[in-house]
Amino acid sequence: MVAYLNIHTAYDLLNSSLKIEDAVRLAVSENVDALAITDTNVLYGFPKFYDTCIANNIKPIFGMTIYVTNGLNNIETVVLAKDNYGLKDLYQLSSEIKMNALEHVSFELLKRFSNNMIIIFKNVADEHRDIVRVFDSHEDTYLDHRSVLVQGIKHVWIQDVCYQTRHDADTISALAAIRDNTKLDLIHDQEDFGAHFLTENEIHQLDVNPEYFTQADRIAQKCNAELKYHQSLLPQYQTPNDESAKKYLWRVLVTQLKKLELNYDVYLERLKYEYKVITNMGFEDYFLIVSDLIHYAKTNDVMVGPGRGSSAGSLVSYLLGITTIDPIKFNLLFERFLNPERVTMPDIDIDFEDTRREKVIQYVQEKYGELHVSGIVTFGHLLARAVARDVGRIMGFDEVTLNEISSLIPHKLGITLDEAYQIDDFKKFVHRNHRHERWFSICKKLEGLPRHTSTHAAGIIINDHPLYEYAPLTKGDTGLLTQWTMTEAERIGLLKIDFLGLRNLSIIHQILTQVKKDLGINIDIEKIPFDDQKVFELLSQGDTTGIFQLESDGVRSVLKKLKPEHFEDIVAVTSLYRPGPMEEIPTYITRRHDPSKVQYLHPHLEPILKNTYGVIIYQEQIMQIASTFANFSYGEADILRRAMSKKNRAVLESERQHFIEGTKQNGYHEDISKQIFDLILKFADYGFPRAHAVSYSKIAYIMSFLKVHYPNYFYANILSNVIGSEKKTAQMIEEAKKQGITILPPNINESHWFYKPSQEGIYLSIGTIKGVGYQSVKVIVEERYQNGKFKDFFDFARRIPKRVKTRKLLEALILVGAFDAFGKTRSTLLQAIDQVLDGDLNIEQDGFLFDILTPKQMYEDKEELPDALISQYEKEYLGFYVSQHPVDKKFVAKQYLTIFKLSNAQNNKPILVQFDKVKQIRTKNGQNMAFVTLNDGIETLDGVIFPNQFKKYEELLSHNDLFIVSGKFDLRKQQRQLIINEIQTLATFEEQKLAFAKQIIIRNKSQIDMFEEMIKATKENANDVVLSFYDETIKQMTTLGYINQKDSMFNNFIQSFNPSDIRLI
């Protein structure tokens, strides 16, 4: 059967719908022996194509389609690699095209790379002869079977394949419409482009010279390039004085070990072992390269994380400064990182502060050269939800229908159209009419195809040779990328290092910088005490908002129950709070508070599991158990752990026998051996790498330390990192206020784009003000730095240029209080805007003329705006309230009524709100209902009042008052809302609460003596309410007696308490 020399796969993005696996499947079914991948200008699909062909006994041929030009005419051309030299030429040619965004390839460029290639010109017409003649002397130049005759050049049959069968031609039209953002023509019958995979029968019916088919086979036989995997492509580290990398590495390690105050003999023994493993595997250059770039970061003001993943288990990494985790102190295993019995590339991922990560990448590019460093390509795919909308759009579906499609496909990771089709509503939509069925048919054909490229978030490839020698390159948004994915590039043998940006490191660095600048305190995070009781008190209270790894509601709950006392408790929590091990959290907490409940299957488990109270949490513990009981080396134990996590039945059974045999030889009874194996098998699936847990727990602890000791700086930087999120900002500001931190309005003489900490509190960011853009803030801050603080509002107006000084800007700054420090009311400053915008006062930047021509008294003093209006403007311009909102102020005074905020209310609990908006609508049945916006002084929430409730409370809604509402929370369009069942004025609710309270709970007994005569030991009548005291120190409630609600002193008793110290239930 003839070879196919012109296959366009789906990696010819939006030009082909032919998946590689389908092309190979068709080749097998049609007895095709060889396939050539020839995507246009790119080599994205090479590794997958090669692997799939080899697995199915199809000969893979590597090629590419290009368009060759002489400046006047262009000709479609297929180039194929004859051997591995040709393969490298393809890499470089594709790289040239993609790096320089070439649409056409000059014949000079093609000639540069053609020596080891076969060239096939397609559809050659008379006007193309001049281009073809340039390649007369090239022994492997051909014309396709449709081309005109050119003397001396042979013809070959070549079938352009872009889709599976003639019935799939519509996929090409659909992809073109998606690519070009046009509509799909559904009126006319779909044209068959003749670019499908021909069957044997269809080929026999072709009117083509049989010699052309034979020529295709000959060409296929000439093409023998192969992809080489697992090459040794590590770059060499340039050592001082050309010393060998092995010797240099050892000298550096021993020197560093001597500097540290450690048990030298113990650490030296571990170091010798690790060094031997690393050098035997040939990875000494790798460690020196990573150490070098981390050293650069740390000496150039770029914060680096303490470690990530299993690399923190290496003493070599610790001594080189790659990590800051002592693996011996924390009982970490080197073999979990680098296993001498399973040779794989070491994988050190590095966390840098996210705002300076690019600085380190730039250093690597400068050190190794631009063509020696690249990012890695990733592909976005036409997954179910995306393809459904894309195809709907090109078929002309209106927005309502597109939204309906989106709502019918569940938000489930990896969901397929077949899965969605099992849902009745989706199935009904598909079969609503023929158009929808056609839509679904096209969607199914396109589902899963790669749609576009993007850049891998972290991976960087480094080599001391130009990368195009080993893999093709392309141009990304921020630099070069390999055309192959991370897994494919690593499999070739290229060095990949993940440069990850971690926001929390930026926050820590910023806090340290500001504390040093403002307070003169130089905090060395490597020397802070890791047994600070204030830190553990913070964690025990669950006060972990903004703290890395510990801020979710679930983790807070665990921390409150656990009451951490040691750093190890943090390590355990971060490891346990994940799907799977979460079920062990209650056991861990119970045993942590009562160690007597810890039981071990065998006494020899105690040294391994003592720190985790008998619970297996870490992967390293599984390895230690295998070593202790079965006498496994840690390398063997790591292989066992991996086998267990993969659940391969055959491998597992083999490892079970290996383990039991090892335990028997080690003197353990077979019954206990089986029990131990089953125990570690249970936990192997979700055991967490302890090295990673320790590293990330260290970041969590550092942030907790900074939050405890420098709260103003902590909250200011957390707030700066949530600029743009009104909800998160409001929540963080509310928490900061609860911690006693004063939130200051934006100050024109103090504030910046970010939040600014100070001794007095935190100045809000000017950048949070709606209508004030970054450039305006930049101008204001630069003017302040260059010429000093602004003296007053008019000085500000004089010094800021006209292009920035708009009415919109001035109003926004005034209404959020940016000029409050000048001692004038906001209403006075609003009145003054017209004056500063008048032309005769706008004497550009000339202070002398301004002082002469401007009257000294220009303010027309006005009374301050009402509190409610100030709050309204703050909410409008900032998205939250700086001054205390009237509702929030009333909440503080009335919290004794046991009322709730929107953020912590549950179904049917009373919530104090005002109605910001009431939108009345009429239902299809002619009944009135309303959509409302609820405001609790901190945040807003949508609510709905259905007809029955609306009829009941319609009159109340017309009042501008504070209300107590209750109802049921649910989701509408993925947004939380409250279905309101009951509405009362605050006054009515308070009156009823005082009259019908069933219990009074106090947490401060200092007022009790004044009302001793009111408190009775027993309940004497129906009006007596139980009085209880809640002791927070021991978390215990005790009954003090009873108080009569009808007593004339009842209200006085209630009001004598601080509202936060009493609750009516």
From Swiss-Prot:
* Record EC number: 2.7.7.7
Q: Which UniProt keywords apply?
A: Cytoplasm, DNA replication, DNA-directed DNA polymerase, Nucleotidyltransferase, Transferase
Similarity remark: Belongs to the DNA polymerase type-C family. DnaE subfamily.
Name a Pfam family for this protein. DNA_pol3_finger
The highest taxon in the source lineage is Bacteria
The keyword Magnesium appears for this protein: no
Instruction: Provide GO CC annotations from the record.
Output: cytoplasm
Q: What is this protein called?
A: DNA polymerase III subunit alpha
Keyword Signal assigned: no
Disulfide connectivity for this sequence is: none
GO-annotated biological processes: DNA replication
Q: Where in the cell is it found?
A: Cytoplasm
User: Partners and quaternary state?
Assistant: DNA polymerase III contains a core (composed of alpha, epsilon and theta chains) that associates with a tau subunit. This core dimerizes to form the PolIII' complex. PolIII' associates with the gamma complex (composed of gamma, delta, delta', psi and chi chains) and with the beta chain to form the complete DNA polymerase III complex.
- Which gene name does the record give? dnaE
CDD domains hit by this protein:
DnaE_OBF, PHP_PolIIIA
* Role description: DNA polymerase III is a complex, multichain enzyme responsible for most of the replicative synthesis in bacteria. This DNA polymerase also exhibits 3' to 5' exonuclease activity. The alpha chain is the DNA polymerase.
What the entry lists under NCBIfam families is as follows: polc
- A molecular function (GO) term: nucleic acid binding
UniProt-listed SMART domains: POLIIIAc
Please give the catalytic activity noted in the UniProt record: DNA(n) + a 2'-deoxyribonucleoside 5'-triphosphate = DNA(n+1) + diphosphate
